[in-house]
């Protein structure tokens, strides 16, 4: 099992995997949901630029997208924001991930977060924080298994840091 960074050459298999993830799910946004394949190809180019901190719209930060691949099969998506903003501190942190519906409940969420944490450290991201909707017990468990420490909460979210 491995993480593969998004490439402008990614094709149909990645597109189909992303179609197995809802548009918004547990606060994870899948912008590819509802896109045509041609739109997906254009989105890849934009995301590749963002990973290089180029052409980022105001109010956004650079992010790098990775695919979780198991035996050449795309399983899930992970996003690493290069830095935290006030908005992302409250609403998402700097790592987000989702597993395609047909692969859930098999430990892939735990694995993708483990690999994303290593990648974030390799990228020299100093502060790693995740937020979780309070009803999303599966993601809470994944974060705790990977060493996340609860440091705050409110009526809607749990806030975790990795030290």
Task: Please tell me what each predicted stretch does.
Residues 1-94, 155-163:
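GNAT-family acyltransferases
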Residues 20, 81, 106-123, 155-156, ...:
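Extended, folded domain segments that form the structural surfaces/walls around functional sites
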Residues 83-85, 102, 135:
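Short coil/turn motifs at secondary-structure junctions
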Residues 121-131:
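Conserved GNAT acetyl-CoA-binding A-motif
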Residues 130-138:
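Conserved beta-strand-loop-alpha-helix junction that forms the acyl-donor binding cleft
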Residues 131, 144-162:
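Conserved catalytic-core motifs of GNAT/GCN5-like acyltransferases
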